[in-house]
């Protein structure tokens, strides 16, 4: 599993946008287009499983109503920027399981090294 953690974003953000990024009012964060473009140049993503119809980064995407956790990601190259709340563990578990099946999954997540999901699902992958 490929994993990009939030410190990659910090280098690209100003103080103003960084403050917005770490607000606790929401657990959803739009990926800066410039960051996505750099990653997409390398990976050629085909699926965004954690999207809204307004912030989808790939032509194929799943919204909350479609529940990307219940979908099969086989044959896809996945860009995943999951909600950063408690449900992140379920998303990381899904990404890990799909990666074991051979799916490339790049996750944009906070570096919460004190959590189980980090140790169980992020640490076995490639962290950038």
Regions found by a protein language model. Name each.
Residues 2-128:
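Class I S-adenosyl-L-methionine-dependent methyltransferase catalytic core
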């Amino acid at each position: 599993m490929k994993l990009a953690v939030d410190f990659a974003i910090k280098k690209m953000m100003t103080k103003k946008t960084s403050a917005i990024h770490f607000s606790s009012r929401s657990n959803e964060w739009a990926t800066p287009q410039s960051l996505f473009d750099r990653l997409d140049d390398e990976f050629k993503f085909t699926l965004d499983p954690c999207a809204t119809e307004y912030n989808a980064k790939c032509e194929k995407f799943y919204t909350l109503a479609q529940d990307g956790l219940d979908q099969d990601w086989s044959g896809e190259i996945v860009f995943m920027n999951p909600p950063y709340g408690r449900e992140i563990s379920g998303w990381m578990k899904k990404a890990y399981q799909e990666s074991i099946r051979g799916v490339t999954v790049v996750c944009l997540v906070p570096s919460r090294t004190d959590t189980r999901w980090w140790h169980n699902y992020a640490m076995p992958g490639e962290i950038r």
